[in-house]
Amino acid sequence: MGMKIKMDVAKFKEQLRATADELGRATRPAAQEGAQIIYLQARLNCPESDAAHMFHGTNAVYGPYSPGNLRNSIYQVFSKDNSFKDVSTYHISWNADKAPYGAMVEFGTSRAAAQSFIARSIKETRSEVRAAIKARFIEEVNGK
């Protein structure tokens, strides 16, 4: 004697899709929460001159730049190109048009040591960022 079980899993699949969509929507605000922490720390870590200054590159002299120019050029932006349904990416950097010398400060030159402010901020805030992302993700999924 056999037994036959018939099950319609359409409703179950629909619920799973809804849950996956909900989880996907939570990634962007969670990622932004972490990006904000790094962004604020980068602004604090960014070196600032005491007076207006020129910046000497290999092929050009840039400036004059006012104190805080590099700090004020730091931004964060959501990256549509590097984000997907369940992955949200933010870029934190400096505006190279406003502060073309940013890379020379962040990475150094053959004559000047690096004064990292972006990479240093990522390292310094790593555990705080992870906790903030996790908390915001849970908050978003649970409906605040």
Where are the model-predicted features located?
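Short, low-complexity, charged/polar segments at coil/turn and helix-coil boundaries
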Residues: 14-111, 131, 144
